[in-house]
Amino acid sequence: MEQLHFINPETALILVLLSSLLFAVIGILYSRKYRGYSNYLTAGRKTGTLSLTSSLVASALGAWILFGPASAATWGGIGSVIGYSLGTAFPMIALIYLGKKIRKTFPSGITFTQFIFHKIGKNLFKSILLLSVFYMFIFLCAEVTAVAILINYISSVPLWTPAALVIATTLIYTLYGGLRASILTDNFQFLIIIILLLVCMYNIFSSDFISYQDITNNSGNLLSGKYIPNYTAGLTFFIAVAATNLFHQGNWQRVFAAKNYEVLKKSLKLSFLIIIPIVFFMGITGIIAISVDSKVNPDLAFFSILLKDKSELLYMVIIILAISLTVSTVDTLVNAISSLIVVDGKKINENLKSSNGLVILLSIIALFVASKGFSILYLFLLADLLCCAAVFPVFYGFYKRNLKERDLIISVITGLLLGFLLFPSPDFSKSILVGILLPFDLFPQIVTSSLLFWSFLLATLGPVIVIISYDSFKRR
């Protein structure tokens, strides 16, 4: 990725350090008044509507929104924008119903894996525990890498420096204060994120180089109902993003942290309504960017139009926005991983120490990945596939009493096998079935050009068909 070097490295580092330290100080000072495992893991189960809403939104919106939606829109069109928006927000609606079920069954619960263990069985519990930790670790790497690349892009600061500052300051207050600290800092980060996004929105839409006519003339296909990727990309992002977020323990922690179910329900509805327009706006900037410059780097689509005038103030806004987005997500991930490890053990005190050690180790690995600028997109897609295969069996199992653990595991394996047959190779040119087992020419273009879509679709629908067929067979 090219570098702008518009802000000198010292200024960029000062902004990163001050922003990160601000959240660390707030988190530590607040947490000193609220000690104990209940506050650390569930924030005392006393979180109100405004606080819970802002925490849910801030946790859902990481630095990925600065890159992902706009990049996808440059080739996936308006469909990918809608899919990304709904996929990010949909878990909030799903948690209204799933949250009610799990809070009623386990009023003193902490993790969703507890429910799986008691309701379904030990083997599926272990698999989902590993899946959840794997997904959140990949998410952690992606967030730290994204902010490191962004700061490097606009100021030439070495990748490891902002990554180390963000990880270190976040770990300090998160491992000390737990969920209480995370939710409080989320409240501040939410306000900063909303204000700075409004600043970005105003600057983009008040620019004289953007017009609807230019967009329709230069990128009309991205808005067309006849453009197939509008549908395949939209469904791909919806399925993948929605499925993975249901396995995000950070969301489930907030389900248990709500003061009562009415607070939870209202907060989730508000979060849904706030998330959709934010992600939609970020996606639309990709369509605008590609219409202004057909050769734009997709990963930089949002920045290419926001920073077109090279305003130093806007560069500073971007740095503060990126840090707020990253820290809000990283502290959620750290808390979530820690809670899974703690609750899985019998002795909470000993497990809290071991969980902190493991979280620090994972953070060091994430720092290494970020310092090298490695792309972990393929691992992210792999985690998406695993979640797609597991999402229906696991959450359907929340409600069905007569389903055996063995049958649910078989359905997950079926989904994985079907998904892996069409899961694209690292260069996205072929899959196990298309191009390896069978010749490429045997398949229509709609399959060969959208392998990821068909992979996710089969991984999701395969278990549904298996379970429904099994239910029908048992009724005979």
Cite the ranges covered by each PLM segment.
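Membrane-embedded helix-loop-helix hairpins and adjacent transmembrane boundary segments
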Residues: 1-476
